[in-house]
Curated annotation (Swiss-Prot):
Pfam families: N6_N4_Mtase. S-adenosyl-L-methionine binds at C12, D30, K197, S223, G224, T225, D241, M242. Keywords: DNA-binding, Methyltransferase, Restriction system, S-adenosyl-L-methionine, Transferase. The lineage of its organism: Bacteria, Pseudomonadati, Pseudomonadota, Gammaproteobacteria, Moraxellales. GO terms for biological process: DNA restriction-modification system; methylation. This is Type II methyltransferase M1.MboII. It comes from the Bacteria. SUPFAM superfamilies: S-adenosyl-L-methionine-dependent methyltransferases. GO terms for cellular component: cytoplasm. It catalyses: a 2'-deoxyadenosine in DNA + S-adenosyl-L-methionine = an N(6)-methyl-2'-deoxyadenosine in DNA + S-adenosyl-L-homocysteine + H(+). Belongs to the N(4)/N(6)-methyltransferase family. It is not known if the cytosine of the complementary sequence TCTTC is also methylated by this enzyme. It comes from Moraxella bovis. At low concentration exists as a monomer and homodimer. Probably binds to DNA as a monomer. The keyword Magnesium does not apply.
Length: 260
């Protein structure tokens, strides 16, 4: 088995062939979207993209333990195919999550503009880890909370006490994209990786679907966000990327976390 708590420079297929089967509790995958934003994201056609996608999915599924969970990022269009494929492989559908990026609304003129991505959440069994109390979010209606907190009764007469940690998390997630967060004087700056995911978004996934010392896998590590967040949360990780610059930079950050 490859060394854990390290990002390896290799392609996803060679990497997955060397990861022990049924050793992973959580896989968080941000793969190519076939949007031609870079060489690694470019395919001749959708008919070429799908077999590539299904191939790495098959290998990832072998690595999940019997109660493992899988999250996959992609466009809504691609996720329609991926969702159907995962169901055909016997995976259990949990959620179709919409990530509202709150920026980058695009320039669509023949349809609604896009400012969101899809995150598919599947599990291998009904006994998968899900720590719902770890990912509660603030209540939206403060008046309702105030009334219930003071009297223990809602205005409709039902008895209810708000959870001090917030309400249960839903399927629409509001996180600004990393490129939006790192704007300078209102202008987008060039990032090392073109599509890094926000750390707080990845943190929500890892907190919800893994426990301390679990192994988290990402076979398209990019700038290393999954590994960095996993390490900070006390999880083990293993991952790869083909880009030497991404891998070296991410491993440097991880080593600094170790030192500190």
């Amino acid at each position: 088995m490859l060394e854990i708590n390290k990002i390896h420079q290799m392609n996803c297929f060679d990497f997955l062939d060397q990861v022990e089967n049924k050793s992973v509790q959580l896989a968080v995958i941000d793969p190519p979207y076939n949007l031609s934003k870079a060489d690694w994201d470019s395919f001749d056609s959708h008919n070429e993209f799908l077999p590539f996608t299904y191939r790495w999915i098959d290998k990832v599924l072998d690595k999940l333990d019997k109660d493992g969970s899988l999250y996959i990022f992609n466009t809504p269009f691609n996720c329609a195919f991926i969702c159907q494929y995962l169901v055909s492989k016997g995976m259990i559908f949990q959620n179709w999550i919409t990530w509202d990026k709150r920026d980058g609304m695009g320039s669509a003129k023949r349809g609604f503009s896009t400012g969101q991505e899809t995150i598919l959440f599947f599990s291998k069994s009904k006994n998968h880890t899900f720590n719902y109390d770890e990912v509660r979010v603030p209540y939206e209606s403060t008046d309702r909370i105030k009334h219930a907190s003071e009297k223990g009764i809602l205005k409709n007469g039902k008895r209810w006490f708000p959870n001090p940690n917030g309400r249960l998390c839903g399927e629409v997630w509001h996180f600004s994209s990393q490129r939006h967060k790192e704007k300078v004087n209102g202008k987008t700056v060039k990032l090392t990786h073109i599509t890094p995911k926000p750390r707080d978004l990845i943190e929500r996934i890892i907190r919800a679907s893994s426990n301390p010392n679990d192994l988290v896998l990402d076979c398209f590590m990019g700038s290393g966000t999954t590994a960095i967040v996993a390490k900070k949360l006390g999880r083990n990780f293993i991952g790869c990327d083909m880009n030497a610059e991404y891998v070296n930079q991410a491993n440097f950050v991880l080593n600094q976390l170790e030192i500190n």
